């Protein structure tokens, strides 16, 4: 059995809080995956970090309990433990860093706006909406969001923050 999932180590260590939204509610560590696999008679025999989606983990499990796990399995267990991922302290720090990041981003954007500069968002994926909503970035800060001309989001508005999504041609024309 092979599964690939967002890896919590990347999400937390790289402050990728914007990737947590309705389509991405699961972020795994190897230890909880091991518990899950054991519940169904599987044994993790390999695990590797892969770059997909900002950092994922590919886990190989087998019903054959005689297969010896690769060195990668122990290496990742040790990495997660050494980084404190099995403690609440790690997640409290993550929460604190997210709040600091929000303040830093708002200050940066506000300073640019005070200079009467335009600020345009480029692209409107799901994680964009998470960032906009959490940081309360609206049309007072961002002028609009530019999106590819094939997007179904064109001429619509972002939820909650009400930013208009315009064809990127408008952005290139008005630089």
Where are these regions (language model features)?
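Short, glycine-/aromatic-enriched active-site segment of Class I SAM-dependent methyltransferases
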Residues: 3-26, 30-33, 37
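Short, solvent-exposed loop/turn segments at secondary-structure junctions
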Residues: 7-10, 52, 66, 125-129, ...
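Short aromatic-enriched loop/helix-cap "lid" or pocket-rim segments at secondary-structure transitions
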Residues: 12-16, 59, 157-158
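Flexible, glycine-/basic-rich loop-and-beta segments that form/coincide
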Residues: 53-101
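A short, well-structured juxtamembrane/interface segment
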Residues: 97-115
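A solvent-exposed beta-alpha-beta segment
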Residues: 110-175
